[in-house]
Structures are given as C-alpha cells and as structure tokens.
C-alpha cells in the first residue's frame, strides 16, 4: 500500500480537473445550452470595475449528498456577508440557475459565487450532489483549496457523502470543514452528536484528520430566514471563521508558463468568444499569445481581455477563476477539455507510464480484477478520454486494492506531463487514481491498438 499512500499524500498536480468558472456566470450562452437574448443583454461593453487583489484568494466549495442543503448554505453565506459589504446576496434560485437544475430540483452544474471575509477573498463552487452527475463532481472539485462538506442532521452521512469525500481525497483536496445542516429539524441533541461522530469516523476512513476537522452545527435555512440566531446566522459565521483558519492559503505556482484548462466556451454578442477556467499555474496577461491544445486541435490566438467576477484584470494569477476573450475564434472552434498554454511550453501526449492505485470493493471500486487492454475513461484537467490499460510484463491481473505501475494509451493525444494526477472510471464507478511518472513515445504496437 506504500504507493497508494504516496498517491494520496502527494500534493496534487495543480492542473487536475478544473471546475466551471464564474466569468459572467448565468449571462452568457454556453457551448451546448442556448441562452435567451435577455441573458446576454449589456455584455457588449467592457467591464466597468477592476478586480483589486488586496486579500489572499482561496477557492472553496460545497460538497455532499443531494438535498442536504449545499445551495441553501451557499445562499446563506452570501446573505450574511452582504450585510457587511463582503458579498452580493445570491438567492437560492440564482445559484441554482440552470434550467435543468430548476426543472429537476437538484444541482447538476457547478455554480460559482464570490465573497470576502475580513481575511480573504473566496471563489465558492456549489458542487453537484446527485449520483448521476459524479462526472461533474470530478471536473468540478479539483481546483478547490478546501471543501465545505454539508451533511443533514436528520439524515447523517449518505451514499453521495461518501463518494464525494472519496473523490475529493483522490483528486487532492486536503482540507475539509463540516457543516451539519438542518439541525432545526432534529429535536434530539444526542442524534446530532451521533451524526458528528459518524462524520468524524468517515473523515478518518478517507485519510482526513477526523478528530481535528472543524464541525459546525446549524441551519442554513434559519440563517436565510433570520430565525433562531444560534442555529442560523451565528452558525454560518462560525463556519466562515473555521474556513478562514483551517483551510490554508495555498502556495501558487507563478513562475512556470501559464496553463488554463478550458471548462466552458461562450459567445458574447459584439465582443467575441470567451473561454473560462481556473488558471492552474503561471500568470496570464492581456495581449499574451496562446495555444489551445487537445482533442486533435492546435489553435494559436491572442488573449484580448481577462475578467473575473464581472471585473476586468490586466493579469490573472494561478488559482484565479477567469474568462479570457480570444481573438478571431468562433464558439464552435473550441470545446471543453482543451488546454490554453504558452506557445511551445507543452505538447499533448497519447501514452503515459503511471503509478496507479486500484480502488478496493470496500472503497467503492471494482469487485473483480481486470486484464491488459481493459478500457476505462481517464479524467484529468477538464478532459476525459477513453484509454487502454497495459499491465506490466508478467502481470496477468490487476486486483482491486492493488497499487502498481501501468502503461495507459489514450484514444487521442491530450495534455499530460510528469506529476499530473488523474482518475480512472468505468461506467459509474471510480476504479483508480494515478500519478503520471513518464510520457514515453508511442511504439508501432501501441499505434495498432484497436478501439472498437
């Protein structure tokens, strides 16, 4: 299990699975979903405000089981901070703003809000919670510097609570703060204590410091409706204090060439095409030349504008959730999963050597071993791609719970480099987590692999 421990303890590759970004959230026309003309109104002009970098910037997000109150808590945070000028109040309906979310009553696409405490500036992602949307969970959690795990006091930990914690740990989220929500719906204080105990045991099981993790009990709905201050407003204030103190400000990699995994592509009438994502490393400046690589594309363009939370920037730094206006490209030229990089700084690869931990049955992985040429889907940065797994010479079976060195050949070349983390999934199961150790050239035998 040494390699498994290494994989789980290694600081994450900063580029794994970037999440949706807040660039003009809810007003643009995304690549695959039409927006009404009304939503795009007023975007033909430059942003009037300039983003001021006067506090440390930290990316956090809510995770947890469906209907445990993640979006309600996010709304409550903005309401409380808005009273002191640290946020713009976002109603539940505004956060839960995609048509499919409203229609089905569950959060499908991750939404973003911005707020500031006295100590920090936060970009907050409201992550999806339904089992069918774990794919979004994978691509929506990795850039987070920490998570707020929401657990309903009247339910306790549920299946997606476990799965979200497992995925968060696999993709490198090392710090979690817990909010036990809906405490107003539970009359028995002993039940709340049991839920807290169960959560701490679960955190420890997944490699977190369960005994040290802050656990705050409250009710996000009470905070929103300004009822029962102890369970409502004060509990959310305690949560924000815990996030400020327990989740550290990460060290940003500003010295390397910039790398921006593309999360979404939008078209703004009168201005052009915007790509959004989290800048994983380096500094991106207005006027920079860039390449967009992956999915058999190699597109060169120039960044003509940068914005974050409706505010313009002359330069963006690693960790920023941003939108970049690109010159001379149409929306249909681009897609999610491409990576914007400094020209010549990195190339796509189709084959990697990697140290991979295969999840056991108890961890939610496969029940049975697999053989060479097994074809799972690899998730890294914002892309996912089918791949063939090649076992080491003399190895016939890869067993659940095993850690081993594997070769993986992708269906198409994608951005991969040494130290990059990835997740392997088969159907609706996460089956493995890995770390790239080398990027060798393709052999003739590799090129002849069949994909049908």
From Swiss-Prot:
InterPro entries: EF-Tu_GTP-bd (IPR041709), EF-Tu_GTPase (IPR050055), EFTu-like_2 (IPR004161), EFTU_2 (IPR033720), G_TR_CS (IPR031157), P-loop_NTPase (IPR027417), T_Tr_GTP-bd_dom (IPR000795), Transl_B-barrel_sf (IPR009000). Mg(2+) binds at residue 71. The modification N6-succinyllysine is found at residues 88, 234, 286. Pfam families: GTP_EFTU (PF00009), GTP_EFTU_D2 (PF03144), GTP_EFTU_D3 (PF03143). GTP hydrolase that promotes the GTP-dependent binding of aminoacyl-tRNA to the A-site of ribosomes during protein biosynthesis. Also plays a role in the regulation of autophagy and innate immunity. Recruits ATG5-ATG12 and NLRX1 at mitochondria and serves as a checkpoint of the RIGI-MAVS pathway. In turn, inhibits RLR-mediated type I interferon while promoting autophagy. The modification N6-acetyllysine is found at residues 79, 88, 256, 361, 418. Its EC number is 3.6.5.3. Residues 55-251 form the tr-type G domain. It catalyses: GTP + H2O = GDP + phosphate + H(+). Residues 1-43 form a transit peptide. Residues 64-71 are annotated as: G1. It is found in: Mitochondrion. Residues 126-129 are annotated as: G3. It is an enzyme of class 3 (hydrolase). GO terms for biological process: translational elongation. The modification Phosphoserine is found at residue 312. GO terms for molecular function: GTP binding; GTPase activity; magnesium ion binding; translation elongation factor activity. Residues 105-109 are annotated as: G2. Belongs to the TRAFAC class translation factor GTPase superfamily. Classic translation factor GTPase family. EF-Tu/EF-1A subfamily. This is Elongation factor Tu, mitochondrial. The keyword Methyltransferase does not apply. GO terms for cellular component: mitochondrial inner membrane; mitochondrial nucleoid; mitochondrion; myelin sheath. It comes from Mus musculus (Mouse). Residues 181-184 are annotated as: G4.
């Amino acid at each position: 299990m040494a390699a498994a421990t290494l994989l789980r303890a290694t600081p994450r590759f900063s580029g794994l699975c970037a999440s949706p970004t807040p660039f003009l959230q809810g007003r643009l026309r995304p690549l695959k979903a039409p927006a009404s003309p009304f939503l795009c109104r007023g975007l033909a002009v430059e942003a009037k405000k300039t983003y001021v970098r006067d506090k440390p910037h930290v990316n956090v997000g809510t995770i947890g089981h469906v209907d445990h109150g993640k979006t309600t808590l996010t709304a409550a945070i903005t309401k409380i901070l808005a009273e002191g000028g640290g946020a713009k109040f976002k109603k539940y309906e505004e956060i839960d703003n995609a048509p499919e979310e409203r229609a089905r009553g569950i959060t499908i696409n991750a939404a973003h809000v911005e707020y500031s405490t006295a100590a920090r500036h936060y970009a907050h992602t409201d992550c999806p919670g339904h089992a069918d949307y774990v794919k979004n969970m994978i691509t929506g959690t990795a850039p987070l510097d920490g998570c707020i795990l929401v657990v309903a006091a009247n339910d306790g930990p549920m299946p997606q609570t476990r799965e979200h914690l497992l995925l968060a740990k696999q993709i490198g989220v090392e710090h979690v703060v817990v909010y036990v929500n809906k405490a107003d719906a539970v009359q028995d204080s002993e039940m709340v204590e049991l839920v807290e105990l169960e959560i701490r045991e679960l955190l420890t099981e997944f490699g977190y410091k369960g005994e040290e993790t802050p656990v705050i009990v409250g009710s996000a709905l009470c905070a929103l409706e300004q009822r029962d201050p102890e369970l409502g407003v004060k509990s959310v204030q305690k949560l924000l204090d815990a996030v400020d103190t327990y989740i550290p400000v990460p060290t940003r990699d500003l010295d390397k060439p910039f790398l921006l995994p593309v999360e979404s592509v939008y078209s703004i009438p009168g201005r052009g095409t915007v790509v959004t994502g989290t800048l994983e490393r380096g500094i991106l400046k207005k006027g920079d030349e860039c390449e967009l690589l992956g999915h058999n594309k190699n597109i060169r363009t120039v960044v003509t504008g940068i914005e974050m939370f409706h505010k313009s920037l002359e330069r963006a730094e690693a960790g920023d959730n941003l939108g970049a206006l690109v010159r001379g490209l149409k929306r249909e030229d681009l897609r999610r999963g491409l990576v914007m990089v400094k020209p010549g700084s990195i190339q796509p690869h189709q084959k990697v050597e990697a140290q991979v931990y295969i999840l056991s049955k108890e961890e939610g992985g496969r029940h049975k071993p697999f053989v060479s040429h097994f074809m799972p889907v690899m998730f890294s940065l914002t892309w996912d791609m089918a791949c063939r797994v090649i076992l080491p010479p003399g190895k016939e079976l890869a067993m659940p719970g095993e850690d081993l060195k594997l070769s993986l050949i992708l269906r198409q070349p994608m951005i991969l480099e040494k130290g990059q983390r990835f997740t392997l999934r088969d159907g609706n199961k996460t089956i493995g987590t890995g770390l790239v150790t080398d990027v060798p050239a393709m052999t003739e035998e590799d090129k002849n692999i069949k994909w049908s």
